[in-house]
């Protein structure tokens, strides 16, 4: 794959050409050149070989949303009619982690929305992000991002609620909003809890 990149024009072709001539190069050189899907494969392979705590169970979900965003896919068009739903299998560990949000999200809502890939993968993305950035050195950046997301979704002058009258009568969108809003409120509460350690079991 590095040779292929080196022989074709793209934004990493110069870097690929440089490393294609190296007899040995470091794994982080490889990471610089790999597309997201190949990075996930490399990450999973590494932790299959070297057993330790990792996020392999959740990275496919993160990859799905990253690719959808990168290609400007319209996720709204398929939130209740998930593409590839027959192949979709929700992550039990993720569902169990969300079960801690009993005050914010009802059991019915958790069961319903975690069965849809888009919602399932968005929850996975939020939990992985907040777990990875929980250390003191990254916490300010994490909290800033989550404050922006909370404002966007949950506050009256945020983008989502600013024109809520457009969607109030659409039960599909309104119920989906309440689920996502509940997830974000739960994360904000837990991030402010000094006893909270992590969202996911890894």
What is the predicted role of each segment?
Residues 40-64, 74-202:
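Polyanionic, low-complexity intrinsically disordered segments
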Residues 1-54, 76-77, 131-139:
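Short, contiguous, well-structured surface segments enriched in hydrophobic/aromatic residues
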Residues 21, 65-66:
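Homeobox/homeodomain signature
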């Amino acid at each position: 794959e590095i040779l292929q990149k080196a022989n074709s024009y793209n934004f990493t072709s110069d870097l690929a050409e440089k490393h294609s001539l190296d007899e040995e190069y470091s794994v982080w050189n490889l990471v610089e050149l790999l597309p997201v899907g190949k990075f996930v494969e490399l990450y999973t392979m590494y932790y299959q070989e070297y057993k330790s705590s990792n996020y392999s169970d959740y990275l496919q979900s993160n990859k799905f949303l990253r690719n959808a965003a990168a290609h400007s896919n319209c996720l709204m068009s398929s939130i209740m009619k998930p593409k590839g739903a027959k192949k979709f299998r929700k992550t039990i560990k993720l569902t169990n982690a969300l079960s801690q949000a009993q005050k914010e999200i009802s059991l019915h809502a958790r069961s319903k929305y975690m069965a849809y890939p888009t919602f399932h993968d968005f929850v996975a993305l939020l939990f992985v992000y907040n777990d990875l950035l929980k250390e003191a050195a990254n916490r300010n950046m994490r909290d800033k991002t989550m404050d922006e997301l909370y404002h966007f979704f949950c506050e009256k002058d945020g983008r989502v609620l600013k024109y809520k009258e457009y969607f109030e009568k659409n039960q599909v969108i309104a119920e989906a909003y309440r689920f996502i809003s509940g997830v974000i409120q739960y994360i904000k509460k837990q991030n402010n809890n000094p006893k909270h350690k992590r969202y996911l079991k890894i």
